[in-house]
Amino acid sequence: ISIRLVGSEMCIRDRNWCLNKKAEFKKLILMFQKEVADRIIAKVNTKDYSRITILANWKFNIKKIFDISPECFSPKPKIESTLLEFIPKKNIIKIRNPKNLENITKIFFSQRRKMVKKNMIRLFKNFESLTNKIDIKLTDRPQNISVDKFLILVKEYENQSN
C-alpha cells in the first residue's frame, strides 16, 4: 500500500517500508492488536509495562486514539484493535548503540518478577553508586524502572565499556 496526498503531510505506506527506510515524519498513526497497544502505552509500575514500552517510548510520545471493535472489519477478527499516534520526541536521551537498549531490556525483562539486583551486579562494575545516582533500588523489579532510567543505564553501560 502506498498513498500520497498532494499538498498534504499525510503518507500511508506499507509498515515494512516504514521500518526499513529512514523516513522523516511528524506523526505516525498505527493500528495494533489491543493487547500489544496496551503494552506500548503502559505506564511504569503496571503489569503491562514491558520491553516494548521502553523501546517504543524511547523516541516517541505515544497516545491512544481509540479502540476499534471487531465489528468494524469484514471478515470479523476475534481480537480488538487500537489506533495509536506516534510523535517523534524532539529531545531524546542519546545512546551510542540502540542494540544496547534492546539487550539490557531483554536481560531485565526476561525475569520480570525478579529483583534487579542480580542484573545490576552482572552488568555494572559500579552498580551500588549507579543505583544511588539514578535512584534505582536493588529490590525494584524491571517494571518499576522508567524509560529514562533505562536509557541512563544504557549510557552508563556504554561508558564503562570504553
Task: Report each predicted region and the residues it spans.
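Short hydrophobic alpha-helical segments that form membrane-spanning helices or hydrophobic packing faces
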Residues: 153-155
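Single conserved hydrophobic/aromatic residue that forms the stacking wall/gate
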Residues: 1-12
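Short, Lys/Arg-enriched alpha-helical microdomains
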Residues: 150
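Class I S-adenosyl-L-methionine
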Residues: 13-142, 158-162
